[in-house]
Design a protein with these regions (language model features):
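Basic, amphipathic alpha-helical/coil surface patches used to engage anionic, phosphate-bearing ligands
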Residues: 1-304
Length: 304
């Protein structure tokens, strides 16, 4: 018998009419076979390694919208994913998904007095360059994991600090997106600050939206770290403490083991694979068109 809790945590109850039974079964099997229910008791250690992951996989939570939806910030352009193995980045991503579903969303539901099951994502494109091609395999794996196992968790995607290279790629990628996804995406001018303040208070704005100009600023205010990507930010401190505490509860007399938590990578969704292929072609075309090196490792695109 499948419990209501599993349906709630996986977000499946809201889209059963659109989801094949086989996908539901596959998702539950994926959780069982990979021990996903225990992933929040598997901290990435030592702390220096986790800090390196946080410094190269820029994701965080900056606050809540006026309606109580968690604000998830993603530093798409400046994430390098080059400080650890792919397994640590996958592990960290799934841990944030699970922490959102098991802790953040239930807490928001209680705090705001209504059921909250989705979040708002703000994607910062500052620093986007051709070297992003190197990360397509990892990003496609993460996207596929989310599509198959954490569906319909994002209410709206806001894209900010957009350089020319993104604008050009967006024109060719947008038609490939499913209509329901396309409707969720809003590309804002500059840092998007004015538009975002319509749905959230200033204190909930990600740090990269608080500057008058574009760009990801990292600064402290009133003695607190304002950079929601940093391990020193309150959100990541709470998440990391939670995971370490769960590990101690599970095996109180055993030292926490080092090593990544390996998760099977699903086959890429054909639609995601098509988008990745299109992005790669467009990035390469832009590089040639602008007289840039074809090697993605040493090419920077200015945001002028």
């Amino acid at each position: 018998m499948i419990s209501d809790e599993i349906f709630e945590q996986t977000g499946i109850s809201s889209f059963l009419t659109d989801c094949a039974t086989s996908q539901l079964v596959d998702s539950l099997n994926w959780r069982i076979q990979n021990g996903i229910d225990k992933i929040l008791a598997k901290p990435i250690i030592p702390a220096d390694l986790y800090r390196a992951v946080r410094d190269s996989q820029l994701v965080g939570m900056s606050g809540y919208s006026k309606e109580g939806l968690p604000i998830i910030a993603v530093g798409v352009g400046l994430s390098t994913y080059d400080k650890a193995s792919i397994h640590y980045y996958i592990q960290s991503h799934i841990q944030m998904n699970e922490y959102r579903d098991r802790v953040i969303l239930p807490s928001a539901t209680k705090q705001y007095g209504r059921h909250i099951s989705t979040c708002v994502k703000i994607l910062d494109m500052t620093g986007l360059k051709l070297s992003a091609l190197n990360q397509i395999k990892l990003l496609t794996a993460i996207s596929t994991i989310d599509d198959l196992n954490y569906p319909e968790k994002t209410d709206t995607y806001y894209i900010v600090n957009v350089p020319y290279i993104f604008s050009a790629c967006w024109k060719v990628v947008r038609p490939l997106l499913q209509e329901r996804t396309r409707k969720k995406v809003q590309v804002l001018a500059g840092s998007g600050r004015d538009e975002l303040l319509k749905i959230m208070d200033y204190s909930s704005l990600p740090h990269f939206c608080k500057r008058e100009g574009s760009g990801s600023s990292r600064h402290s205010r009133n003695g607190t770290n304002d950079d929601c990507f940093s391990l020193d930010h309150a959100f990541h401190q709470q998440l990391y403490s939670y995971v370490k505490h769960q590990a101690e509860l599970m095996e109180p007399t055993t030292p926490i083991k080092q090593g990544s938590f390996h998760v099977d990578f699903p086959e890429p969704n054909p639609a995601d694979a098509k988008i990745a292929e299109t992005l790669q072609s467009e990035f390469q075309r832009l590089g040639i068109q602008n007289g840039l090196s074809n090697s993605p490792d040493n090419v920077n695109i200015s945001i002028d």
